[in-house]
């Protein structure tokens, strides 16, 4: 969000006395991060001047000879602009003036006449604003009427003395896009009174046009009639505020509405009253239709989208974009202005589908309260005064009432909090407080429970001011954090094998939280007041999340990779569990001959598992008696420890499970509960004295059946005298079998082996493998 200090001070003059550094610190405490601070470079030696004479230059048709008067002195100027008349007030850059665009004003002869100054265009005194101006404003000089404040300088009138803050506001505080609400927060912080009144005393003139609401996706809806819209000319003092907020000026009527939205955060939309046939109806589309938008693009409206219609046509895609058929144009004199509040999820989904990024769509995609909408409607009526009539206003009344637990804030924070200070601050924010309950501020939807109230209190009582307390936590008493070291060892090993580590949400919907519950945890924790039903329970597995990662990347047309996650699982019925989940969707081993010959299968998955558990010094055995429904019966095994307890599963995912995620690759999974191994001290591995002699390395390839125990083969080859190490270096498919290449290392450690001794060892290996 862009924050203009000039506008903030105009809304709340009391904030003028707050130094900039204190204001920025307050914004940070309130959750609004100040990313940049920019001061507009003002021009020097500018004055307002009244036009006395204007004649055509005798030697140049495109120039005018102008006499202007400023501070009782007359200046003769040569000017190329034509958008002004005698008696208008203009901006004069006197001699020796230096403009913000770098131009220095000196006497200059133009076709025989000397110009003793320059009449300025807005882009010349604020060159950064070029992209926010209309072509008319770019081509002409600044012209004011007699009503401007004669006691202010041009830099003050055009807000060129402004300081602009670029803020990052909390994602759940859409209201803070409006100056009224950010001013209210700041005033509460500095203990100033600030009230935004939403009382509307206008009676509805329902006889003007009939309005009907036929959708539950409308939270509130107001519409007013405004006549003589051509008379509402936005003064440069206000127009320059829009520009400082990086809002493009369009026309006087649109600029008026954009300024109101800037104040309240609630977008507005207007229809030309002449172009409305019959009644106005807000409803969900009953069938697909085409809308020609204000941007002259066609959009496909789908059944269920929220639309606004009259008796003949679609007037707007609610909260997103208006129709070209009902737009305000240069000939419009009467408008119906809509001030509404819609279902943000529906607006966000529709805008995303249609790839529409209008300012209205972005604002309406996040919640605002009906109070904000009502304040906006009140300001609309006040802005257009006697030309405005309220036609219709509807709202759902919602007051969020929560239990008063302010007296428990000290226990929650872990430090003594002054309750009087806390209550005063909350009341300034708009809370209504009694002994038993709190009514949350009318303009806020983000306060759902007492913890949100505590968060508000801590905005005033900065966490930085609380004295630090020593932390008492058992894990800090460990000489070494064995659990961390263990998990790091697992992660490093898998990354070395080419797998990618993932970190996914712990929160899922109720169904997803209980899927792939291989370890029979009884119940998942449910979250109180979740932000969404999709984030309502703590997950009991990682596999659902990892499969969603694959699904997302496949939809984005990214190459799928082998992935894993180590996460903390918190079941209701037991202590915290550490679960490792691995998903293999592509080959682990790359062939040196031909990539197409390599497959991802159960054998390679078992080999990875064996290598991992060997690295971790974990003894295990396979068990066929424990099965899970998500894996093929003939392609899954449980892992049991020395106490015959199941601590993991390995297997191939069934096709029907894969299809729910839109996946077609063969997918093999490893799911291990590593909780009991986290804090075990690692076994010290004894090593023999390094050999003084080089290894003799030999390779042998052999065709093996898919059900052969490779670990057993490797162990038996290692039993042959003088073979110190055996590994699988390659494998590939040939005909109906798999050919494995075993690499073995021969070394006597004490002396060089003769050729005859090496041949004998080779024969022993060959003879052993012949049985397969």
UniProtKB/Swiss-Prot annotation:
Binds 2 magnesium ions per tetramer. It comes from the Bacteria. It holds the Pfam family B5. Its EC number is 6.1.1.20. Keywords: Aminoacyl-tRNA synthetase, ATP-binding, Cytoplasm, Ligase, Magnesium, Metal-binding, Nucleotide-binding, Protein biosynthesis, RNA-binding, tRNA-binding. SMART domains: B3_4, B5. It is an enzyme of class 6 (ligase). Residues 40-158 form the tRNA-binding domain. It is found in: Cytoplasm. Residues 691-772 form the FDX-ACB domain. InterPro entries: aa-tRNA-synth_II/BPL/LPL, B3/B4_tRNA-bd, DNA-bd_dom_put_sf, Fdx_antiC-bd, NA-bd_OB-fold, Phe-tRNA-ligase_IIc_bsu, Phe-tRNA-ligase_IIc_bsu_bact, Phe-tRNA_synthase-like_B3/B4. GO terms for cellular component: phenylalanine-tRNA ligase complex. Its cofactor is Mg(2+). It catalyses: tRNA(Phe) + L-phenylalanine + ATP = L-phenylalanyl-tRNA(Phe) + AMP + diphosphate + H(+). One of its GO terms (molecular function) is magnesium ion binding. Residues 397-468 form the B5 domain. HAMAP family: Phe_tRNA_synth_beta1 (MF_00283). Belongs to the phenylalanyl-tRNA synthetase beta subunit family. Type 1 subfamily. PANTHER family: PHENYLALANINE--TRNA LIGASE BETA SUBUNIT, PHENYLALANYL-TRNA SYNTHETASE BETA CHAIN AND LEUCINE-RICH REPEAT-CONTAINING PROTEIN 47. Tetramer of two alpha and two beta subunits. This is Phenylalanine--tRNA ligase beta subunit. It comes from Ureaplasma parvum serovar 3 (strain ATCC 700970). The lineage of its organism: Bacteria, Bacillati, Mycoplasmatota, Mycoplasmoidales, Mycoplasmoidaceae.
């Amino acid at each position: 969000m862009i924050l203009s200090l000039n506008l903030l001070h105009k809304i709340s003059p009391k904030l003028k006395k707050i130094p900039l550094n204190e204001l920025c610190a307050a914004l940070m405490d309130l959750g609004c991060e100040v990313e940049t601070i920019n001061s507009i470079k003002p021009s020097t030696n500018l004055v307002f001047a009244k036009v006395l004479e204007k004649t055509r230059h005798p030697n140049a048709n495109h120039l005018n000879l102008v006499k202007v008067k400023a501070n009782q002195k007359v200046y003769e100027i040569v000017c190329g602009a034509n958008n002004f008349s005698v008696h208008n007030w203009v901006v004069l850059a006197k001699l020796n003036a230096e403009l913000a665009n770098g131009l220095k004003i000196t006497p200059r002869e133009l076709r025989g006449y000397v110009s003793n100054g320059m009449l300025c265009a807005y882009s010349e005194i604020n060159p950064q604003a070029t992209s926010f101006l209309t072509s008319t404003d770019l081509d002409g000089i600044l012209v004011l009427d007699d009503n401007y404040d004669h006691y202010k300088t041009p830099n003050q009138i055009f807000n060129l003395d402004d300081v602009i803050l670029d803020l990052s506001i909390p994602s759940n505080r859409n209201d803070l896009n409006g100056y009224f609400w950010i001013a209210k927060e700041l005033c509460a912080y500095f203990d100033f009174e600030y009230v935004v009144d939403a009382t509307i005393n206008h009676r509805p003139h329902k006889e003007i046009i009939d309005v009907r609401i036929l959708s539950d996706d409308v939270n509130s809806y107001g519409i007013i009639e405004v006549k003589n819209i051509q008379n509402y000319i936005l003064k440069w003092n206000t127009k320059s505020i829009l520009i400082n907020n990086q809002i493009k000026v369009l026309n006087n009527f649109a600029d008026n509405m954009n300024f109101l939205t800037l104040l309240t955060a609630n977008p507005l939309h207007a229809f030309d009253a002449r172009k409305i046939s019959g009644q106005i109806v807000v409803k969900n589309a009953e069938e697909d239709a085409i809308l020609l938008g204000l941007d002259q693009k066609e959009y496909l409206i789908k059944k269920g989208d929220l639309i606004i219609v009259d008796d003949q046509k679609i007037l707007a895609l609610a909260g997103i974009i208006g129709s070209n058929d009902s737009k305000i144009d240069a000939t419009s004199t009467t408008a119906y202005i809509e001030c509404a509040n819609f279902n943000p999820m529906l607006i966000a989904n529709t805008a995303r589908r249609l790839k529409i990024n209008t300012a209205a769509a972005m604002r309406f995609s996040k919640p605002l309260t009906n109070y904000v909408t009502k304040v906006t409607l009140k300001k609309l009526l006040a802005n257009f005064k006697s030309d405005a009539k309220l036609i219709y206003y509807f709202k759902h009344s919602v007051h969020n009432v929560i239990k008063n637990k302010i007296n428990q804030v000290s226990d929650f924070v872990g430090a003594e909090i002054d309750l009087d200070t806390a209550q005063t601050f909350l009341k300034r924010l708009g809370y209504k407080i009694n002994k038993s309950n709190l009514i949350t501020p009318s303009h806020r939807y983000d306060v759902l429970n007492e913890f949100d109230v505590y968060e508000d209190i801590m905005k005033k009582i900065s966490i930085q001011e609380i004295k630090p307390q020593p932390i008492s936590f058992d894990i800090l008493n460990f000489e070494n954090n064995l659990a961390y070291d263990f998990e790091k060892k697992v992660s490093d090993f898998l990354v070395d094998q080419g797998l990618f580590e993932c970190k996914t949400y712990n929160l899922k919907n109720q169904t997803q939280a209980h899927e792939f519950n291989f370890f029979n945890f009884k119940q998942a924790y449910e979250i109180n007041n979740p932000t969404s039903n999709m984030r309502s329970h703590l997950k009991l597995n990682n596999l659902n999340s990892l499969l969603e990662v694959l699904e997302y990347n496949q939809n984005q047309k990214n190459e799928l990779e082998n992935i894993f996650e180590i996460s903390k699982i918190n079941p209701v019925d037991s202590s915290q569990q550490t679960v490792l989940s691995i998903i293999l969707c592509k080959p682990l081993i790359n062939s040196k001959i031909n990539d197409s010959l390599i497959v991802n299968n159960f054998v390679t998955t078992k080999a990875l598992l064996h290598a991992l558990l060997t690295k971790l010094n974990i003894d295990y055995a396979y068990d066929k008696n424990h099965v899970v429904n998500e894996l093929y019966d003939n392609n899954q095994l449980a892992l049991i420890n020395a106490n015959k307890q199941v601590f993991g599963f390995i297997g191939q995912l069934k096709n029907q499970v894969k299809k729910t995620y839109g996946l077609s690759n063969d997918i093999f999974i490893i799911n291990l509960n590593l909780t009991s191994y986290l804090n075990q001290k690692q076994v010290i591995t004894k090593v023999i004295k390094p050999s003084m002699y080089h290894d003799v390395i030999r390779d042998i390839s052999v065709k093996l059946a898919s059900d052969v125990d490779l670990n057993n083969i490797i162990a038996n080859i290692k039993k042959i005298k003088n073979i110190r190490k055996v590994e699988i270096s390659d494998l590939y498919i040939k005909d109906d079998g798999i050919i494995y290449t075993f690499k073995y290392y021969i070394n006597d450690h004490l002396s060089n082996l003769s050729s005859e001794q090496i041949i004998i060892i080779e024969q022993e290996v060959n003879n052993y493998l012949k049985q397969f």
